Amino acid sequence: MRLNVAVFFGALFGALGVLLFLVAFGSDYWLLATEVGRCSGEQNIENITFHHEGFFWRCWFSGVVEENNSNIWKFWYTNQPPSKNCTHAYLSPYPFMRGEHNSTSYDSAIIYRGFWAVLLLLGVVAALTASFLIICAAPFSSHFLYKAGGGSYIASGVLFSLVVILYVIWVQAVADMESYRALRMRDCWEFTPSILYGWSFFLAPAGVFFSLLAGLLFLVVGRHIQIHH
């Protein structure tokens, strides 16, 4: 009875972890950036460019917002314009764009971004592999498959933990926002970029928690089956 309860909760937590990982992987809201520029000299109107990016795409669109209004709601699906500009994020990580920075900065950004992308892909593969192993283990009560599935869940949790840490380092240290701001201020007498972590980013740590918990439960289940059968 206790074994069945552990398997049930392990499967539940594992499914939640995989779902959160897949949504974080497929959505383009790891980063929300707002560029506020006063280029026309008007005091009460701000020309704003909104950026959001994920693994696959980086998109941006323009808007005009009155002062004292919150800009974060502009990223909500229903508040976005019907058309916007998008480019492959792994080819142009924000704020680095080809032609706007020297080749050394751009190449370094691409290498860092590529390493982050590889870890993200490995995390997704590990989570899907873990789910497959657990599905195969259930009919046969195989302690080996339960342990392998649990280890894969733990591996996916560790990989996504590294993904989150690397992304924080990217935003806080690697992305040279000061140089980007200085470049844009050549055209606008006042330019202020603002960066926030998006909801896709926050889904990843939640997935890490459920994935690690599922992995530990399945390791315990596998150990229990090995001892008593």
Swiss-Prot record:
Entry keyword annotation includes S-adenosyl-L-methionine: no
Entry's Gene Ontology cellular component terms: plasma membrane
Induction is noted as: Up-regulated during myoblast differentiation.
* Glycosylation-annotated residues: 47, 68, 85, 102
Question: Origin organism of this chain?
Answer: Mus musculus (Mouse)
Assign the protein's first listed, main location to one coarse class: membrane
Write the protein's name. Transmembrane protein 182
Positions on the Extracellular side per record topology: 27-114, 175-200
What are the record keywords, sorted?
A: Cell membrane, Glycoprotein, Membrane, Myogenesis, Signal, Transmembrane, Transmembrane helix
Q: Show the InterPro entries listed in the entry.
A: PMP22/EMP/MP20/Claudin, TMEM182
